[in-house]
Swiss-Prot record:
HAMAP family per UniProt: MurA (MF_00111)
Residue ranges the record marks as coiled coil: none
Pathways per UniProt: Cell wall biogenesis; peptidoglycan biosynthesis
Pfam families xrefs: EPSP_synthase
UniProt keyword Metal-binding, yes or no: no
Function: Cell wall formation. Adds enolpyruvyl to UDP-N-acetylglucosamine.
Binding site for UDP-N-acetyl-alpha-D-glucosamine: 92, 121-125, 306, 328
Annotated protein name in UniProt: UDP-N-acetylglucosamine 1-carboxyvinyltransferase 2
Signal peptide range: none
Protein family membership: Belongs to the EPSP synthase family. MurA subfamily.
EC number(s) from the headed UniProt entry: 2.5.1.7
Amino acid sequence: MRKIIINGGKALSGEVAVSGAKNSVVALIPAIILADDIVILDGVPAISDVDSLIEIMELMGATVNYHGDTLEIDPRGVQDIPMPYGKINSLRASYYFYGSLLGRFGQAVVGLPGGCDLGPRPIDLHLKAFEAMGVEVSYEGENMNLSTNGQKIHGAHIYMDTISVGATINTMVAATKAQGKTVIENAAREPEIIDVATLLNNMGAHIRGAGTDIITIQGVQKLHGTRHQVIPDRIEAGTYIALAAAIGKGVKITNVLYEHLESFIAKLEEMGVRMTVEEDAIFVEKQKSLKAITIKTSPYPGFATDLQQPLTPLLLKADGRGTIIDTIYEKRINHVPELMRMGADISVIGGQIVYQGPSRLTGAQVKATDLRAGAALVIAGLMAEGKTEITNIEFILRGYASIIAKLTALGADIQLIED
């Protein structure tokens, strides 16, 4: 069993570069199936989710070369075969294969997706959109069968009952090669959606409105190869900004797009965090006094649900009482009992997280229950006095590229141990 060992209490300093966006690349890779030639992605993060996606692509017949942060995929050999359940089940974003396989073959047989357990994240919105486009859905054991029964998938006017990044991207990808026009209303607006649309448009798609709540896709017959730069990971950037404010004595975070983090940075400023925003970087100073605040997550451009857990350890340094309300994922509270083991004055009351600061954290044995909870525990371990041991670290490695090396370069005493 692998684990992370941290000897905390050491102030961090230096510079850390943000990698390409996990939430983009897990959608970009399956979308490449639609291309009729080689596609190259630059800025691909070195995370286990990417390794899983590459393995699935190769099992399907794609030719893949991955060197440094450059990923080259030739999808011309991809075959219409059932997706391996074991691989699919370990990866929540595997549902992005639905749209690309429907767009290319008009059918797909896939295992139901896995990933972090954050409560209900139903794929009903995806399936409702596909059904509007002429797809029939059936189930057999642990597999889901999607088929147009030999017909070409067709355009449709689709209203998303709730705002969903995954369903918006999946529908957009499926519609790219559909017959006719597709309109998605109440679409999610996240930067990762714009990134996927940019890739598809550079391949020859006709997509307009990505980043707004109405996206229009005019189906095309062919998509060619292209080269695409993955956007920086705004969640990784926010995580390192929170870490720098919590335990830094001057940390510069580079490869940052400020406009993707405006709501997050606004809440930090409300706390009293001192930082300087540069063209593509943010410098976080050593902090003095911080004020407790209330956080409420909401769809982009609101405060990202993926950042409430990594921010929690910093909130524990603030003076006063505050509340965290996650309106997106009801089970994003699993980091709370682990932080309590470390001495945090924090609890869950009526589904909301309530904290009282400042809390003095001490090292403990804790368990990462999901990706962002794992990030919170890493930050807490760096803040704490003494030794912290984090288990179940596969979640952390799913989403944070080279995290041990990056933190070590900032001066952290952190190791990944293979037991």
